[in-house]
Amino acid sequence: IDAVWYHKPHLPKNLRLMQPPEYRPFVSKQFRSLWESLAGLLADKIWVSPYWNMIRAENKPHQLAIANNIGFEVPETLITSNPDKVREFWKYCGGEMVVKMLGTAPMDDKVIYTTKLTDKEMKEIDSVKLSPAIFQQWISKKFELRITVVGDKVFAVAIDSQSCPGNEIDWRHQNKNLKIRPYKIPEIIKDKCIE
């Protein structure tokens, strides 16, 4: 083995069928242990993307802090499970706010997409007590960028999320008809991405 392509590993699809269901967390942990073992055994090989980097990338607060520290503009952000704090932040944002998962989705590889909160959802915000989440001021956009860094090479694509109904908030929601095109980003942005 000379190189490892490690991109979005998934648990076996039939794991959700495992009976009794109490065994699922155990088996899930065994797969995580396998991936960690491979990361150690193959540490001297080329990884795309390195296992431990992917683990760090799952930590959204860490990502936000890094982005802010290297000079990217980061939306106003609140991480909490306190509904009163969410209500205060909602007012601060003028009712223009999104909610995101704090981490990756462990539930059968399902994704909970970024959602723009409405007055109706804010009336039910007490449910946030069950689990912390990331709340951010909504920023309108013309399109979204997906940037991939491999070594010192930076590849960017523009995702035309605003022209595809259902994708205006989160391009991943219904990505079948999305137009994606190469995009030239400024050198200063490239440098920050490599940093």
Predicted regions and their residues:
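Conserved N-proximal alpha/beta basic substrate-recognition cap immediately N-terminal to
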Residues: 1-73
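ATP-dependent carboxylate activation and anion-phosphoryl transfer catalytic cores
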Residues: 184-195
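Phosphate-binding site of ATP-dependent enzymes
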Residues: 85, 91-185
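Rossmann-like NAD(P)H-binding beta-loop-alpha module
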Residues: 70-94
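Short acidic/polar capping segments at secondary-structure boundaries
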Residues: 11-12, 52-56, 79-85, 103-105, ...
